[in-house]
Amino acid sequence: MLRKLTPLALALLPLVAGQTIGETPEVHPKLPTWKCSNRHGCVKQDTSVVIDAATHWIHEKGGETSCTGSSGPNPNLCPDKETCAANCVIEGISDYANYGVQTKGSSMTLHQYLRDGNTTKSVSPRVYLLAEDGENYEMLQLLNQEFTFDVDVSTLVCGMNGALYFSEMQRDGGRSELNPAGAARGTGYCDAQCFNIPWINGEANVEGAGACCNEMDIWEANARATGYTPHPCNITQLYECSGAECEANGVCDKPGCGFNPYALGAHDFYGYDLEVDTTKPMTVVTQFYTKDNTTTGALVEIRRLYVQNGHVIQNAVVSVDGESVDSITADYCADPSSAFNRLGGLQRMGEALGRGMVLAFSVWNDAGSFMSWLDGGNSGPCNATEGDPALIEKLHPDTHVTFSNIRWGDIGSTYRGKRR
């Protein structure tokens, strides 16, 4: 919906744009990636990452008062979006290591905690992949393609989640007169959980809306459990929800239709010294097959495989309703009462992958449920309390995840390994 501004507000927009970006420079850590094809091999891209806008210092122009309050934008500085843009400055970040992000070559490590003198602080970074121009997000279109990365989860204990996923954010991060920084400062985040966040597309969320969009979780994991999950929505790109639209029966599928080997009965497949051995780095491959095997066809299957020690490891084969299953298909997600199917299922998820999605990386833990939905109870081997963030901070302050060698392209073009 277009907003109507008064002539005075329109006159101020160029001034607002000039005031919004602070003086501290933004230095994006380099993280090269590769685009691959069966015909031409893999071509290196000079890509980089940017940390989420909310991690940046957003403060009063000419002062140090934060523009973010305890439950949203500071109401004194941000009574409305236009006033907020005039009052507030978003600073750059010149050293991402201070926020738990370290890159070296084609590798990136995300730390949950940092030592600061005699204290430990939680930083829990979330970053997005920028295109070679450094101003816009890299948009990945993955229908009838595969996405591959190497990962080391060996220090991610119970209760941790080193995540890699796709979000249907806007390419420019919602760059506008009120948000001239855009993707270059990490604006525009959204996902299928439709969270009420202080800033939506870089503008003050004074209405308390939720930021919704299609989400494809490629990798949610620690050393004890893993899952991959499509979360379709019945909207495109970032949608500002309100009321019931943001809830369980709203515009997005919050639980999704996931594949967690442990939850499906394969208890000896993934973990310490198991078939996929999490004490060692591994290669993770996710393939998006279409009905007609073209990059414009309907998504019909999301397949997973691993490569470790030079050998290809097929995904765990599990039994669901008496059928052997090792991938996500319409039959696997067949529950007609699920939000997944109500909102369009694989068809809708595929449409988002066809339009293009932004790659996000994060590391986090969960004070509410101790990440038990991922690695406890029926979902994994972790007990009810060991995922407590207070316990993790005390016993495992160096917990981190390392992602590297990110590539995508034609199916079969991004990995090598011997079949067992």
Curated annotation (Swiss-Prot):
Glycans are attached at N118, N234, N293, N383. Keywords: Carbohydrate metabolism, Cellulose degradation, Glycoprotein, Glycosidase, Hydrolase, Polysaccharide degradation, Secreted, Signal. Its main location: secreted. InterPro entries: ConA-like_dom_sf, Glyco_hydro_7, Glyco_hydro_7_sf. It holds the Pfam family Glyco_hydro_7. GO terms for biological process: cellulose catabolic process. Its EC number is 3.2.1.4. CDD domains: GH7_CBH_EG (cd07999). The active site is at E215 (nucleophile), E220 (proton donor). The keyword Coiled coil does not apply. It catalyses: Endohydrolysis of (1->4)-beta-D-glucosidic linkages in cellulose, lichenin and cereal beta-D-glucans. GO terms for molecular function: cellulase activity. Residues 1-18 form the signal peptide. Has endoglucanase activity on substrates containing beta-1,4 glycosidic bonds, like in carboxymethylcellulose (CMC), hydroxyethylcellulose (HEC) and beta-glucan. Involved in the degradation of complex natural cellulosic substrates. This is Probable endo-beta-1,4-glucanase celB. It comes from Aspergillus terreus (strain NIH 2624 / FGSC A1156).
